[in-house]
Design a protein with these regions (language model features):
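Short glycine/proline- and acidic residue-enriched helix-loop micro-motifs
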Residues: 63, 189-210
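Generic beta-sheet signal
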Residues: 8-9, 13-24, 89, 228-239
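Short catalytic helix/loop segments, enriched in acidic residues and glycine
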Residues: 109-125
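Phosphate-coordination/substrate-recognition cap region in phosphate-metabolizing enzymes
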Residues: 4, 122-190
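Acidic, low-complexity terminal tails and accessory targeting/binding regions
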Residues: 31-92, 101, 126-127, 131, ...
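Glycine-rich N-terminal loop/short-helix segment of MobA-like nucleotidyltransferase
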Residues: 97-110
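Amphipathic, non-transmembrane alpha-helical scaffold segments
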Residues: 2-3, 118, 141, 183, ...
Length: 251
């Protein structure tokens, strides 16, 4: 079945393929597409009428997969699925900054939220209004901390613990630059960053492995701090959150 899907995809550009199936079948399909066909089955939860989106990009005679979303249920009446397990962690990326809007690599430059970023945090807080968080963690940079503060504005007494190990990847000499500027000076390195980011060390910056080591250590400490029925907010960055999710899925 997967081979037939990929054949259809690889022969046509801009395909949108709708697959409606069962819990176990869809979990196996997702795991196969991300290259983990025998692992992670119990790590994926799929609610009734939820949807997941996977972006496939042609790469020679093969493909690469990007997870857009898993188990999306915001279109249903119950915004947040019921809790399974002893505690729950909500992992959130910070809202928009002016550099995000302009398409600049910001990394560890401490840019605050812009108006749209604050609005995004407000909407996230409204979406999570029925969640009574009792623990909160944030990267020690302005944009995630501001995001956490806005989300928790109805629970201002809850202390947000800032964690240095959750700060964004260091883009080195790329920080503050537009992609077009980087392409002029480091065209080959930028191409590799888009195709195989795990193999790239940015000039005077960090690698994905560097971020993985510090972010996973910090996240595991957060997990070990959990007590029964804890509801924990954690706000960090794009690269940090991706490494955490990849570690959880075993990819």
């Amino acid at each position: 079945f997967i081979k037939e899907i990929l054949k259809t995809f690889l022969e046509k550009e801009n395909s949108n393929i709708l697959i409606i199936g069962h819990n176990a079948i869809l979990r196996c399909l997702i795991l196969s597409l991300i290259g983990r066909p025998k692992k992670g089955f119990r790590k994926i939860r799929l609610e009734n009428a939820s949807f997941s989106i996977l972006n496939l990009s042609k790469q020679n005679d093969s493909y690469k997969t990007q997870i857009e979303c898993l188990n999306q249920t915001s279109h249903l009446n119950n915004c947040i699925p019921s809790k399974i397990g002893d505690s729950r962690i909500f992992l959130i990326r910070h809202g928009e900054t002016n550099w995000n809007k302009e398409g600049r690599f910001q990394g560890q430059i401490d840019i605050p939220l812009n108006k749209n970023g604050k609005d995004q945090a407000e909407k996230t807080g409204e979406y999570l209004k029925d969640i009574n968080f009792n623990k909160a963690f944030s990267s020690s940079m302005k944009r995630p901390y501001e995001t956490a503060q806005i989300i928790l504005q109805k629970n201002k007494d809850l202390k947000i613990r800032m964690i240095d190990s959750l700060i964004e990847i260091n883009h080195g000499l790329w920080e503050g630059k537009l992609e077009s500027e980087i392409r002029e000076e480091w065209p080959y390195l930028l191409k590799n960053w888009h195709e195989k980011p795990e193999e790239v060390i940015m000039p005077e910056g960090e690698s994905i492995s560097n971020v993985y080591e510090r972010s996973i250590k910090a996240f595991r400490e957060i997990c070990l701090s959990q007590e029964y029925n804890d509801l924990t907010l954690t706000v960090a960055h794009d690269a940090v959150n991706k490494t955490i999710i990849c570690d959880l899925l075993g990819i």
